[in-house]
Amino acid sequence: MKKGEVYTGYVESIGFPNKGCVYVTDEDGERHRVTVKNALPGQKVAFRLTKKRNGNSEGLLKEVVEKSEFETDPACKNAGKCGGCLYPGFDYEKTIEIKEAQVKKLLENYLSDDVIYDGIKSSPVCDGYRGKMEYTFGDEFLDGPKVLGLHKRGSFHDIVDASDCRIADEDFGLLVSHTSGFFSEKGVDFYHRMKHTGVLRHLLVRKAAKTGELMAALVTVSGKDTMAGLDSDEIERLCNDWKESLLSLKFKGKLTGVLHIINDSPADAIICDRMDVLYGKDWFTEELLGLKFKITPFSFFQTNSLGAEVLYSLVRSYISEDVKGGKVFDLYSGTGTIAQILAPAAKKVTGVEIVEEAVEAAKENAKLNGLENCDFIAGDVFKVLESYADSLDSPDCIVVDPPRDGVGPKALLKILNYGVKHMVYVSCKATSLARDMEMINAKGYRIVRWGMVDMFPFTGGIETCCLLERL
């Protein structure tokens, strides 16, 4: 096999989260294993060999030659085009079967025969479950049709129409199609990052699954740069006209906020230089397990609220006895969701989170829920545990819910040295969990109970929840 050549083969398995294992037999009859991202079990694919070193071969997917036996016609026209869903045409039960096998394989060295396994729990809703989406104004290809949608898989520039995205809330589709048509009719161009021309950048939408409250935020340049094509006053009038047009639409939910975010940053990200409320308010309320949470445009909050209830119920059940009247650390606490769910039974809960805005939101939400035994600290977990060593009471149990990269080695060692009887590790990336388990095991902890929650149906994502016990 030679680098740069195109080969075909069948995908025999898939590693977490999207690494298809393709086997190719060369002219000498020797079988070669090649990892091809986004190639799915059962498919026959064509790929270009991009890496061949020390027995590790990688390929770039070029074409699906034959569908998998597990595939049907996908419910989304952008299947395989956008970077969202990995399994758009697969039967849902098959997708969770694949994810379950992937995580079990990663954790096999840490799962003894007596470990209690609670299985993989499905999301209560599999379609339209996302309560937050960030859409980009752009063109389908260079100088192609203008569109409001999602980035094409593997592209920084090409955008695909996402008005009928399967996993986004139904109201988002109406917002996208209407907004796209509104500005197309007005002849307003999108912002060209390389040329610094144009006005429109993003559309940020959020919705609460329980309350139905809906927020729409349009992101544009300020108009201070004359190359934008419109000045600040013209952009302001345009945004107000857009707002008025939204108020005439019939949503399933209730539109409670229309915002205008100004962003002059060169980065292709939603960065807020200034935010104006055009209608309603710049926040809404979501409910989880009987508690209320105030959500702003930039709040970190689970995108699948109903799935989050399943996950957090699992966390609570694992340490319910330890929490009763005890002191709890909720590390990497985000907006303090887990902390507040555990707080009613605990003596005290201390949350640590590096994002200051999230900490302020956690404090505000705790006050909203009448919880006086929650304390939230802003800072890096390791540094906080080091600097507050004398003032923090030793915990009776610990919950860690780190970002995708997992817990850093210094922080993990510090956490394990508390020596609590039980810990819960919530992981959104099973490879990071498997890596961290090596140190966790070495420090005398083992998994005694675990389960998974499919928070993100049809994507490669899966949440894993492990109860760890000190031997």
Positions of the model-derived regions?
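Short, conserved phosphate/pyrophosphate- and ester-handling motifs at nucleotide-, phospho-/glycolipid
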Residues: G42, A168, N304
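Short, solvent-exposed loop/turn elements at beta->coil junctions and helix N-caps
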Residues: G119-C126, R193, H202, M452-M455
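Internal alpha/beta scaffold segment
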Residues: H157-R201, S222-L259, P266
